[in-house]
Design a protein with these regions (language model features):
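Bacterial N-terminal signal peptides that target proteins for export
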Residues: 2-11
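C-terminal motif of bacterial Sec signal peptides marking the signal peptidase cleavage site
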Residues: 18-22
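N-terminal leader/targeting pre-sequences
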Residues: 24-354
């Protein structure tokens, strides 16, 4: 009798435990498997049309051989819907869509997408994406894909942080001047950014790297994308010369060349900015000599020699009182002026007007 009562007490408990275990097993069966995440790389997305909008693209390697990209933008408008894509080539070159990254919600500034292939079905892994020749565009809206709110080079096109900036001085128009900055890419190529002040709205200004120094002049080696007069900006990928010779970041630093920015395609003879680059860059070391008047007491000036990276020099003769239209030859002679001597070196003539 006592045994039966004990069984009555334990039987409901046993059945209850079986039901709980059964429910627990059912829950485990319906839960999706968790995908682990491994290495990650973050790329910067710079502002384009709106200087307040910028962000990052975090690329994540998943354990199941898929890739997740998390886009995070700051200051996107509430309610905005911003399509994003990975494109082929660099941002400076432009290219077709490789991978669709979904929509960045303006309210959160975020978008997350996981994939294992390009839009055309070509498989891609995390490692392949780190070496990909591409860039990311985030657009204003599906109806305005032409307006970009953020952009950044990725993969082999990522910038290393190494850069070199050259000054571009004014030529025909004293209010136009600026800089040319070359930034190294992971693949050894370079992003060239020309930034000019004082360019006219609507102006289109061709630019080139020429052979030799500016004072010597020379043929065109490399063609930049034209400078937009409204923004004063030009961006160009630097990978090869016009003759298809390889030409990357390290080559820029050593080139025997100079940059010319022209007024327009129809007036290449008028220069708006110019600067020596590469081995012709000036080091900042200089020496100035006085040139006293001789036959005409109102004409006098200076001769300044500025050292170049390659050890050569830029000689600038500056005279006051020269007549408009005058052309005045100049030379370095042997010995002292009081002794006199033969010609050792010939300068380019002094332009009397300037």
């Amino acid at each position: 009798m006592k045994f039966k009562k004990t069984m009555k007490l334990f039987l409901p408990m046993i059945l209850g435990a079986m039901v709980i275990a059964s429910c627990s097993n059912d829950d485990d069966a319906t839960m999706p498997p968790t995908v682990g995440q491994g290495d990650s790389t973050t790329y910067q997305l710079g502002s384009v049309s709106d200087p307040d909008i910028s962000g990052t693209a975090k690329v994540i390697d998943n354990d199941d051989n898929t890739v997740t990209i998390e886009l995070t933008l700051q200051n996107t408008p509430s309610g905005g819907m911003h399509p994003a894509h990975i494109h082929f080539n660099t941002g400076a070159e432009g290219g077709g869509i490789a991978i669709t990254l979904g929509i960045v919600e303006g309210s959160t500034g975020m978008s997350t997408v996981t994939f294992s292939a390009l839009d055309d079905g070509t498989p891609i892994t995390y490692e392949a994406l780190l070496a990909f020749d591409g860039y990311i565009n985030v657009h204003a809206s599906a109806d305005d894909l032409g307006t970009l709110v953020a952009q950044g080079d990725i993969g082999q096109n990522e910038l290393t942080g190494e850069s070199k900036t050259y000054d571009l001085g004014s030529v025909a128009i004293p209010t136009i001047f600026g800089t040319a900055t070359f930034e190294e890419r992971v693949n050894g190529e370079a992003l060239a950014t020309i930034l000019l002040e004082g360019t006219p709205d609507g102006g289109i200004h061709p630019g080139h790297i020429h052979a030799n120094s500016a004072v010597e002049s020379g043929g065109i080696l490399f063609t930049f994308n034209p400078v937009n007069g409204t923004t004063g900006i030009s961006k160009t990928n630097v990978a090869m010369l016009n003759d298809e010779t390889m030409f990357g970041y390290s080559d820029v630093l050593a080139v025997d060349g100079y940059i010319n920015i022209h007024l327009s395609a129809d007036d290449l003879g008028t220069l708006v900015a110019q600067g020596d680059i590469g081995q012709n860059e000036l080091t900042g070391e200089s020496k100035t000599y006085d040139l006293g008047s001789v036959a005409l007491p109102t004409i006098f000036g200076t001769a300044t020699f500025e050292e170049r990276v390659n050890g050569e020099a830029l000689a600038t003769i500056l005279l006051e009182g020269t007549p408009d239209g005058g052309i005045h030859p100049g030379h370095i002679h042997a010995n002292s002026a009081v002794e006199s001597g033969g010609i050792l070196f010939t300068f380019n003539p002094v332009n009397g007007t300037t």
